[in-house]
């Protein structure tokens, strides 16, 4: 009986790891430009899910401790024209679209690696309803 319970727990954990791994997901982000003074929401794809990681109890200075996160492996960029911007202003906005994901180190040059970032729906202006 105990072996059956242990096997069920093991299979459940395996399923949780395999079925909820790092993968593409649809998200809605708010985009804004200073010249336009409002936000619009657009749909794009980004990476989300779980990556195996561990934090050592005893830190070894000779061995760097890098936490792996679900992040993009490949990106493309799409450009849209924001409606309602002032004349003679640049109304084009380019945003990233993830096409492939993996578990890897967070690249702070291109990604918000903070624990509590502003989030994809943050907007400093009022939102324009289409």
UniProtKB/Swiss-Prot annotation:
Recorded name of the encoding gene: FSHB
Spans traversing the lipid bilayer: none
GO CC terms, sorted: cytoplasm; extracellular space; follicle-stimulating hormone complex
Name of the protein: Follitropin subunit beta
GO BP field: follicle-stimulating hormone signaling pathway; G protein-coupled receptor signaling pathway; regulation of signaling receptor activity
InterPro entries in UniProt: Cystine-knot_cytokine, Glyco_hormone_CN, Gonadotropin_bsu, Gonadotropin_bsu_CS
Species this chain originates from: Mastomys coucha (Southern multimammate mouse)
Sugar-modified residues: 26, 43
Record's keyword terms, sorted: Disulfide bond, Glycoprotein, Hormone, Secreted, Signal
Predominant cellular place of this UniProt entry's protein: secreted
GO molecular function: follicle-stimulating hormone activity
Protein's job: Together with the alpha chain CGA constitutes follitropin, the follicle-stimulating hormone, and provides its biological specificity to the hormone heterodimer. Binds FSHR, a G protein-coupled receptor, on target cells to activate downstream signaling pathways. Follitropin is involved in follicle development and spermatogenesis in reproductive organs.
Location in or out of the cell: Secreted
Glycoprotein found in the keyword field: yes
Disulphide connectivity of cysteines: 22-70, 36-85, 39-123, 47-101, 51-103, 106-113
């Amino acid at each position: 009986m105990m072996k059956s319970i242990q096997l069920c727990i093991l299979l459940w954990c395996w399923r949780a790891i395999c079925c909820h791994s790092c993968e593409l997901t649809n998200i809605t982000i708010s985009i804004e430009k200073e010249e336009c003074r409002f936000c619009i929401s657009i749909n794009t794809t980004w990476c989300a899910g779980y990556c195996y990681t561990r934090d050592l109890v005893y830190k070894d200075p000779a061995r760097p401790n890098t936490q792996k996160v679900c992040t993009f492996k490949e990106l493309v960029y799409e450009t849209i024209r924001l409606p309602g911007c002032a004349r003679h202003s640049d109304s084009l906005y380019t945003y990233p679209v993830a096409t492939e994901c993996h578990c890897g180190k967070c690249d702070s040059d291109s990604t918000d690696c903070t624990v509590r970032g502003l989030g994809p729906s943050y907007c400093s202006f009022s939102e324009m309803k289409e």
